[in-house]
Amino acid sequence: MKRFPNPYRLSCLAAFVLLFCGCSPALIPFDEKVPAQALSYIGAPPVFDARVRFREIFCELLDDNRQRLGLKIGCDDYLWRLNDEPQAAASQKSLPAHDPGLNILIVPGAFSDCFEDIGKPYQDAAERLRQMGYQINNVDVSGLSSSPKNAEIIAGAVGKQNLGPSQPLVLLGYSKGTTDILHFLVTYPELAHRVTAVLSVAGAVNGTPLTDRFSEAKYDNWFARLSPGKCRPNDGGVFDSLSRVEQFQWLSTHPLPEHVRYFSLATFARYEDIQLHQRITYKFLEKIHPLNDGQLLFLDQLIPGSALLGYVNADHWTVAVPVEEKFSDRDPVKRAENRKLRGLLFEALILFLAESLSSPL
């Protein structure tokens, strides 16, 4: 079968989704002046607020590198300040010291191996920190496989880590990578004891209503045809694992290990700041809630019992992967700015973890 170029496939996907999104207006207007929210099950461990300290770290990094990187964006323009976020103390702490002793495994999202050149989160930023001595590696999960299948792959990667005495092992999950990590922690409890912390970036913690719509209509095969032929062998379960119905039910019946420390960074953006190929799915999700990133609702991205680091003003791809550098309607200046901000964001996340994991709860 003839395969179209990637931009064409993505445009076809957007047009296809339009048929099922309709054009009715959102019931709730876009308003960032709301409190932080999480959709969770009764009895779930509460999310606690760590936004003030993370904002301090990111904003100081931004100010320190603004001139060197040629960035003009304000910190509050990049990190949303919802109306319940406490104000920082008058005397702020200094930036934490780097801790190259952290061992970090990055688990990418769905379709990551299908678009290998753009599917790995924070590639440039991770390389910079590797040069500082950090051990940062990617877990080669299967982009079209289920979370149980990828949990097995993560287990293999965790088991191979040569950790020093008391060396922290951090699992960083992006998008469905977070879902895969949570399944690993529950399914492989002995190996899970090697894990110190889990950091979720735009994580599909509860799944997404988008997948329920498409899976219910049995469009899985159609989506598979859109993806390139270089996807690795898989069990085809990616959509089931991203289903809000399936994942939320799983989460409510599978308590997460209590010895692991959890951190969540969420995303949402205005329609005009969403990449072209996600605007149709944004409009679909907008009917449920306008605070979404084009793939996930903002209230579906927080791990129960995690520390909430903040909300990034970015769409689902821009926050972690360089999709717009390959396929984008944005001008080159904006693309370059987003790439630089992504690097600073990754460093801020690692600095926050270094500080947090150096002290007990």
Question: Language model features by range: what are they?
Answer:
Residues C23-D117, L361:
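Flexible, membrane-associating and regulatory peripheral segments of lipid-active enzymes
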Residues A36, P257-L361:
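C-terminal catalytic-base region of ester-bond hydrolases, centering on the histidine
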Residues I118, T208-F214, D273-Q278:
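Short aromatic-enriched loop/helix-cap "lid" or pocket-rim segments at secondary-structure transitions
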Residues K2-C12:
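Bacterial N-terminal signal peptides that target proteins for export
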Residues V107-A110, S175, G203, T267:
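Glycine-rich His-Gly loop
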Residues L95-L169:
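Active-site catalytic motif of lipid deacylating hydrolases and related acyltransferases
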Residues S11-G22:
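Bacterial N-terminal signal peptides
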Residues E152-S252:
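Serine-dependent carboxylesterase/thioesterase catalytic core
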